[in-house]
Amino acid sequence: MNLFENVKAVVTVRQAAEHYGLKVGRGNMACCPFHNDHTPSMKLNEDYFYCFGCGATGDVIGLTARLFNLSNYEAAQKLAYDF
């Protein structure tokens, strides 16, 4: 397995979101950090997230990359280090 596969096998989107400060509520919903969100509109599934408000979507690496303005490789490294 490569770095990307390893990270995706170990870390769920919800785990990363909570670790990086997103408050995840009922139904795995959270306020989206990518737009001015006041009510939860981001669905966090096991393997991917989707925001019904702004359309942001991706996997755990994509979420981390967007949260910290990193490349996918840098985000995968950060996840490997943090988890």
Predicted regions: what they are:
Residues 1-83:
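N-terminal structured subdomain of primase-like DNA metabolism proteins
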